[in-house]
């Protein structure tokens, strides 16, 4: 196959060369016979154009790919259908030590060959003889490391390399601790199988063809890997368990592929607003700013999911990932990873077991302070000390329960120009204001962000001190400075700025943005944005949470972006929802999905963010907002109930707030359990009722904690809806 392609290409190039020689010979004879300098120039110009066009057509067109706008989600599946890339298919187990769980898998080199059949072009995988040079330096079908570890009685770790080079040992900030080693699994070996049996599941490794089979404790197959030998067609309907070597840069990308069954449902993957069950969807795990929870992009993608069949998976990588859950082939779960190696944790059990195991690995949240569960009053934005006092007075005058007043982008001299300093013109004595508000029972939260425009007063200092993410030339990749939180000196500088605010009485920091870390940037960690982009919110959240904990001994912040590891730092909110029914539905689905991804605490802007909220929508959204772990009124004004002419809005706001405050003993007790077991406060029904088939299909209701069923009214003009009980 490959050799024939090269021979044909060589003949084509030879034909082109002969054509060029003939063309130039004809031009020379024509010009000589005309004996005209002007005509010679014209003929030569035409000839040059012809040759240029022919030359461009003769070049192989590779790595066409897809063009992306900056910091938009990446689809990692496209690489695996690029004909310029070399594929390696997992084939058989070359060797294996059952005691250490370590061995070698043989990978067959191949590529996709175009195939025309009855006027339809497809592609077929074909084995390929290596053309790499020198031949003695490389393997045609390499044997590469495969390792399986048993972390707990419910957790298994599967690792695979795509090169002979072992990765450097480094600490992962996604993990809360180094995975342990459990000795309870028993191993047996036959001629073609190795079986590790545990109390909650079984892992079977088939030798030839190589296959990993996951079973529950009764022996029922939950899922298994898929090889090239399983292909069911002459065309490529799917790519099996494989990795690629890209023709453009020799980078490797791995694609673990597992089966999906007919009745299977998949949940998780972060704060996703699309259908709660991800089967039939392609989910791109890449931190971005979707400007609201109404699309398939996410502020908080998480490389973790669980199945209704009794298992979950955590893809331990910070590279971009695309999960194809039966979207392009209904029977397969394909995890197209931007990483060259596989590090996959598998969990066995019911949803509660899986969440507990997963959050043991990546970390459980600290308990937020009691006051944080109360009402947060805000808008975009309060601009002055006077507005702060006025809001506080109106809250108390109208008897709305409230614990927090938030100042968004307007507390600086210039709106949105973060310099960690209250405007002297509009905040005459901020420290006294904070003290006065505290005496009235209010905590204060302040907005900020990690980007510095050229007009920001800290811009020159950050450039001088090299505290920013750089491009390949050591300069700014954007017009703005993006703080490099992988640099300890940057973290120290940043935390000192926040400490100045926390020390004068500020209670919490809003950790806004964090989704735009340069993908092609170079970071102080020594890694590129390919691995640091998705980690950026974890580092950002960590920096804010740790300084707040150090100075106030409280686990609190208000963050928008997240990745695996961020769940240790409560809390996060749902971003800039549209002030529409769609915005409300997307917010509910996003919150449920986020909770199924290991996050206990979450909030959202009641009524939406983008525009002023219609009365009917606000009244339907308020009970949903107050029956969430954390509650905030925020967005385009008015958000304050007393500014609505409608008595209905005022009454619904007050009654909803009073309801939550009466429930506070329940709320706090449930929250404490969530920190211990990794459970979400906003809980999908099947978490509590996994044996109810109908509960797995509900995405417009939820449990607030374990005992309160909530069914928000998601349509205009309705007062009742059918619910699943």
Where are these regions (language model features)?
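Carbohydrate-binding surfaces of carbohydrate-active enzymes
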Residues: 126-143, 147-150, 158, 163, ...
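A low-complexity, Ser/Thr/Gly/Pro-enriched, surface-exposed linker/loop concept
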Residues: 67-192, 234
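Conserved small/polar residues in nucleotide/adenosyl-binding loops
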Residues: 5, 723-725
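Extreme N-terminal basic, low-complexity initiation segments
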Residues: 2-9
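Catalytic and substrate-binding clefts that recognize carbohydrates or anionic sugar/phosphate headgroups
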Residues: 61, 138-140, 161-163, 179-369, ...
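Aromatic- and carboxylate-enriched substrate-binding clefts and catalytic-loop regions
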Residues: 161-163, 170-173, 401-653, 688-690, ...
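Bacterial Sec-dependent N-terminal signal peptides
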Residues: 11-60
């Amino acid at each position: 196959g490959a050799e024939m392609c090269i021979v044909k290409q060589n003949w084509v190039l030879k034909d082109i060369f002969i054509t060029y020689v003939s063309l130039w010979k004809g031009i020379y004879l024509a010009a000589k016979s005309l004996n005209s300098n002007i005509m010679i120039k014209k003929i030569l110009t035409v000839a040059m154009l012809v040759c240029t066009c022919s030359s461009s057509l003769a070049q192989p067109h590779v790595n066409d790919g897809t063009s992306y706008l900056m910091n938009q989600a990446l689809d990692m599946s496209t690489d695996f259908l690029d004909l310029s890339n070399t594929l390696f298919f997992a084939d058989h187990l070359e060797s294996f030590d059952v005691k250490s769980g370590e061995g070698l898998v043989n990978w067959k080199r191949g590529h996709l060959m175009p195939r025309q059949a009855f006027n339809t072009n497809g592609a077929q995988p074909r084995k390929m003889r290596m053309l790499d040079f020198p031949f003695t330096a490389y393997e045609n079908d390499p044997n590469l490391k495969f390792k399986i570890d048993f972390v707990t009685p419910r957790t298994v770790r599967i690792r695979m390399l795509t090169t002979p080079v072992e990765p450097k040992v480094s600490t992962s900030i996604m993990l809360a601790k180094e995975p342990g080693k459990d000795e309870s699994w028993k191993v047996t070996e036959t001629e073609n199988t190795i079986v590790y049996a545990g109390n909650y599941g079984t892992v079977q490794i088939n030798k030839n063809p190589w296959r990993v089979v996951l079973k529950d404790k009764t022996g029922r197959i939950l899922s298994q890997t898929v090889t090239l030998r399983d292909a069911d067609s002459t065309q490529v309907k799917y790519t099996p368990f494989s990795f690629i070597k890209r023709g453009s840069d020799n980078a490797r990308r791995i694609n673990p592929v597992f089966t999906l069954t007919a009745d299977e449902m998949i949940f998780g993957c972060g704060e996703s607003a699309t259908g709660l069950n991800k089967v039939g969807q392609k989910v791109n795990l890449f931190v971005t700013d979707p400007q609201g929870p109404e699309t398939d992009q996410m502020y908080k993608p998480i490389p973790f999911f669980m199945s209704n069949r009794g298992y979950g998976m955590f893809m331990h990588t910070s590279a971009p990932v695309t999960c194809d859950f039966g979207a392009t082939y209904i029977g397969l779960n394909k995890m197209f990873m931007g990483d060259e190696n596989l590090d996959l944790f598998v969990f066995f059990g019911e949803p509660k077991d899986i969440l507990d195991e997963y959050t043991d690995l990546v970390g459980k949240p600290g308990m937020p302070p009691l006051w944080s569960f109360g009402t947060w009053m805000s808008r975009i934005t309060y601009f002055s000390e006077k507005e702060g006092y006025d809001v506080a007075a109106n809250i108390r005058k109208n008897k709305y329960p409230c614990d927090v007043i938030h100042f968004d982008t307007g507390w600086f001299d210039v709106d949105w120009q973060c310099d960690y300093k209250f405007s002297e013109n509009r905040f005459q004595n901020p420290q006294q204001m904070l003290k006065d508000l505290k005496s009235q029972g209010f905590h204060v939260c302040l907005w900020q962000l990690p980007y510095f425009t050229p007009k920001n007063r800290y811009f020159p200092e950050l450039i001088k001190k090299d505290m920013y993410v750089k491009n390949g030339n050591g300069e700014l990749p954007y017009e703005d400075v993006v703080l490099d939180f992988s640099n300890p000196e940057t973290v120290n500088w940043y935390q000192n700025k926040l400490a100045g605010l926390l020390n004068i009485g500020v209670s919490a920091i809003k950790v806004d943005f964090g989704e735009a870390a340069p993908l092609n940037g170079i970071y102080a960690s020594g890694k590129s944005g390919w691995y640091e982009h998705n980690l950026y919110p974890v580092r950002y959240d960590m920096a804010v949470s740790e300084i707040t904990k150090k100075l106030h001994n409280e686990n609190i912040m208000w963050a928008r972006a997240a990745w695996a590891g961020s769940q240790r730092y409560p809390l996060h909110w749902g971003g800039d929802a549209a002030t529409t029914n769609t915005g409300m539905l997307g917010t509910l689905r996003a919150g449920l999905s986020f909770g199924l991804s290991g996050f206990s605490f979450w909030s959202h802007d009641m009524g939406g963010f983008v525009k002023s909220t219609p009365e009917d929508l606000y009244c339907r959204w308020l009970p949903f907002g107050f029956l969430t772990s954390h509650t905030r009124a925020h967005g385009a004004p008015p958000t304050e109930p007393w500014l609505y002419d409608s008595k209905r809005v005022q009454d619904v706001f007050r009654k909803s707030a009073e309801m939550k405050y009466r429930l506070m003993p329940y709320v706090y007790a449930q929250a404490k359990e969530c920190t211990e077991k990794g459970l979400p406060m906003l809980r999908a029904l099947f978490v509590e009722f996994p044996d109810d088939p109908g509960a797995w299909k509900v995405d417009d209701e939820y449990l607030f904690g374990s005992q309160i069923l909530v069914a928000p009214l998601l349509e205009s003009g309705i007062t009742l809806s059918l619910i699943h009980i």
